[in-house]
């Protein structure tokens, strides 16, 4: 039987470690990590490069999903980052600045669970702890792609997956 765990998040700096509340015999095993998909769509080329701002504004949306693989305690967790680079930050007077590029990165990993893990701890392990391992390489792929597309690399801060998971759960209630 396949179980799916899903959450949608957006970002702020990292904080709490969910694994602190687990028995010491329990653990999250990190397997392979891989780039699932990558796409970038640069708007209005080559004209977009004529008046390129020194530091475009970036808007991001982050999705985290997890699914069990077969009957084993093995899961695929995917971190999807969708970003848009804007000419400038939106303001009240100009809420829709010109889009320079649209980027989508899906970075995934295989994770195993060992030991006696309470059922209510599985979801936070998959949607909080696992994405913490996936975010640094996903961010690196994203920054390199933006740079290779001819734009200045944005400054992307770590995401607090625990806070965002809790916020999403509160919205669902």
Curated annotation (Swiss-Prot):
| Self-association and partners | Homotetramer, a dimer of dimers. One homotetramer interacts with 1 SecA dimer.
Gene transcribed to yield this protein: secB2
Q: Which Gene3D superfamilies match?
A: SecB-like (3.10.420.10)
Functional description taken from the UniProt entry: One of the proteins required for the normal export of preproteins out of the cell cytoplasm. It is a molecular chaperone that binds to a subset of precursor proteins, maintaining them in a translocation-competent state. It also specifically binds to its receptor SecA.
Instruction: Spell out the subcellular localization from the entry.
Output: Cytoplasm
Q: Which family does it belong to?
A: Belongs to the SecB family.
> For this protein, what is any one GO molecular function term?
unfolded protein binding
Please spell out the taxonomic lineage of the organism that makes this protein.
Bacteria, Pseudomonadati, Pseudomonadota, Alphaproteobacteria, Acetobacterales
Superkingdom, according to UniProt? Bacteria
What residue ranges carry the coiled-coil annotation? Answer: none
Q: Name one GO biological process term.
A: protein folding
Q: What is this protein called?
A: Protein-export protein SecB 2
Query: What UniProt keywords apply to this chain's record, in alphabetical order?
Result: Chaperone, Cytoplasm, Protein transport, Translocation, Transport
Q: To which species is this protein native? A: Gluconobacter oxydans (strain 621H)
Q: Which GO terms describe its cellular component?
A: cytoplasm
């Amino acid at each position: 039987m396949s179980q799916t765990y899903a959450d949608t998040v957006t970002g702020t700096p990292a904080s709490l470690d969910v694994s602190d509340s687990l028995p010491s015999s329990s653990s999250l095993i990190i397997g392979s990590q891989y780039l699932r998909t990558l796409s970038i769509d640069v708007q209005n080329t080559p004209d977009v490069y004529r008046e390129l701002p020194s530091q475009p504004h970036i808007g991001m949306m982050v999705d985290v999903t997890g699914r069990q693989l077969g009957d084993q305690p093995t899961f695929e967790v995917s971190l999807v980052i969708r970003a848009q680079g804007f000419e400038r930050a939106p303001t009240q007077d100009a809420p829709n600045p010109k889009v320079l590029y649209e980027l989508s990165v899906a970075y995934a990993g295989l994770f195993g669970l060992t030991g006696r893990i309470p059922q209510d701890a599985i979801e936070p392990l998959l949607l909080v702890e696992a994405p913490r391992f996936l975010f640094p390489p996903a961010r690196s792929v994203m920054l390199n792609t933006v740079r290779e597309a001819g734009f200045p690399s944005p400054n992307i801060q770590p995401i607090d997956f625990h806070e965002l998971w809790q916020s999403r759960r509160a919205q669902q209630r």
